[in-house]
Amino acid sequence: MKIFRHLALMTAVLVPVSMLWGRPVPVRQDTVAAGAGGHDAVGGGCIPVLSLAEEDLAYQAGEHFDFTVHYSWGIINSDVGKASVDLDTMTVDGRKVFHCAVYGKTVSWYDLLFKVREDFQSWFTTDGLVPLRFTRDTREGRYIARNTYNYMRNMPEPHIQADVYSSSSGQRNVELPLDSCTYDLPALFFLARNMDFDAVTPGVRYPMTFAIDDDVYNVYFILLGRETRKIKGLGHVRTIKFAAKLLAGEVFTGEEDMLIWVSDDDNRIPLMFEAPILVGTASGRLSGWSGLKHPFSSLVRSQGRQ
């Protein structure tokens, strides 16, 4: 039955960064400077990004993405989950902010084995992409988890005020550490799309911190280069390829990097990922989109949408 849970978690993994959760291990100081996956150098500070002024961002309110999660292991080779990402704007305390809604679910046949529903909501500033609030509502089989985060930046010691519930541990109110490189997963997803690849050194690991449940975790981004790749349902696309390194945990092996391809155009669309998990390999691909800010100019030969 554990394999079903692994796949369920991968349905959630697809989206915020296309991909960044799944019960990793909390960050330890001795792991931050250690080489991993063949990438030894660690860049200082947060990932380099382009201008975060609203008019310069890679996206706009009204953008929508659909994704499909696929699993392969031996004779098993099937789509197991769907996910969507929507971005809009709203007014909070008199201030215009972005609101991101991320939904993930297992497909109907997989519901019979292990039903999953994921709902992530994030609010962050339109200028600077500063996280303000985050909620999570997760159901994985009989397991339930809910998070509510408020970012307390104006306190003597900035922190995330986290109201966390799980069906296994009950209700908890905790304070999570907060610095300028700490994001919730949807906010990190949108920050990463503004990465300045011209300022990134290939092969160097750039650390970021994300919060989920009652802890914070490190993820490392590694630029690998550019390539034209054929993606099922899309066609041939010019892409920027990079890796995300996560620490080993319940789903990820920690031995290999998750590979991510984004469009090599002004949209920086997340197109595809591949990730080795403890049993088999999971992948995700873009299956639908609308409301792009810029032309999808990296799509050089289209197969039409699935």
Describe the residue ranges of each PLM region.
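Bacterial N-terminal signal peptides
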Residues: 8-18
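Active-site/ligand-binding surface loops and adjacent short beta/alpha elements
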Residues: 155-212
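Acidic, serine/threonine-rich low-complexity disordered tracts
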Residues: 23-153, 196-306
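Positively charged n-region of N-terminal signal peptides that target proteins for export
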Residues: 1-6
